[in-house]
Amino acid sequence: MNKTITALAILMASFAANASVLPETPVPFKSGTGAIDNDTVYIGLGSAGTAWYKLETQAKDKKWTALAAFPGGPRDQATSAFIDGNLYVFGGIGKNSEGLTQVFNDVHKYNPKTNSWVKLISHAPMGMAGHVTFVHNGKAYVTGGVNQNIFNGYFEDLNEAGKDSTAVDKINAHYFDKKAEDYFFNKFLLSFDPSTQQWSYAGESPWYGTAGAAVVNKGDKTWLINGEAKPGLRTDAVFELDFTGNNLKWNRLAPVSSPDGVAGGFAGISNDSLIFAGGAGFKGSRENYQNGKNYAHEGLKKSYSTDIHLWHNGKWDKSGELSQGRAYGVSLPWNNSLLIIGGETAGGKAVTDSVLISVKDNKVTVQN
């Protein structure tokens, strides 16, 4: 294994000497969202504020082009999906009209032909932040994410506390010192039909909801990898949603990034190989939680994973490394590979570069 990773490091270095995967993003980019339509990549929100950009990946002179600004204000943790030529943006965390941080449950649609946005008369039955979105048979599916009432209440309390550090410490201790099930992360699967702009119940996880999971789908199968089980506590769980036939089946696969797990990781598929890379977490938090410490990440430093794992023969194998740990960027399918755009590294620093992870014969190639 060490020889393999050493060889990969040499490959990474050789790629670094060549042209970068994509031009640097116009601003350091993290906690945003993105989608790809044919060969055009779209990214926006997060550290980009209300800005959106597109890039034609097959153009001779690749460059990011600014699009119409998002009308719903700056958002973190929104998700997006392309359906029938339009870009849909779901929820996120931002400021309301009173300047208070909140979780949104709204939907916006962007029309690339007119470079224009419209807010739809449609609201999900629950807040959407930390959720994942994927497309299947012309519908968008949403699952996971924080509980809107609990999350909004936390920020209302912080707003009232203002600069009173004693009150803030008390609020944080109260917020984080609960068991995972007491946060009521969303375990329902919702479907959104663009033709009717209606939300429907599509099922629910037999286990628990997560926030900040990585998601990837191919054909009738979708995978949800890791994420938070509660604020500050990750899970190493991997869930598979199988739409084959008339009944949706939920399967639980072998864990990855054990024992602590990560959130904000990246998932993709290359030559039928399922890839999971990066993510951020708190080493030791799982042990703390199992020992009865609900505020499991208290005093721990967030770490950023460089690991690249492949799903092979019913288990995960560490098969390579990123040049640096990163999380909370955008992962997209491109050129039969996993494309990672932006993200944050140690200390929460937003980055502007992109990474391409490809797999052939169970060997990983990383291009920066």
UniProtKB/Swiss-Prot annotation:
Gene3D superfamilies found in the cross-reference section: Kelch-type beta propeller
GO function term, MF aspect, one: racemase and epimerase activity, acting on carbohydrates and derivatives
Enzyme Commission code: 5.1.3.24
Spans of repeat Kelch: 40-84, 86-137, 139-173, 174-219, 222-265, 287-336, 338-367
Signal peptide: 1-19
Active site location: 228 (proton acceptor)
Catalytic reactions on record: N-acetyl-alpha-neuraminate = N-acetyl-beta-neuraminate
Keyword Transmembrane attributed: no
Keyword line: Carbohydrate metabolism, Isomerase, Kelch repeat, Periplasm, Repeat, Signal
Pfam families the UniProt entry points to: NANM
UniProt GO cellular component terms: periplasmic space
Chief site of localization: periplasm
Entry's localization field: Periplasm
Assembly: Homodimer.
Annotated function: Converts alpha-N-acetylneuranimic acid (Neu5Ac) to the beta-anomer, accelerating the equilibrium between the alpha- and beta-anomers. Probably facilitates sialidase-negative bacteria to compete successfully for limited amounts of extracellular Neu5Ac, which is likely taken up in the beta-anomer. In addition, the rapid removal of sialic acid from solution might be advantageous to the bacterium to damp down host responses.
Sequence similarity: Belongs to the NanM family.
Designated name of the protein: N-acetylneuraminate epimerase
Gene: nanM
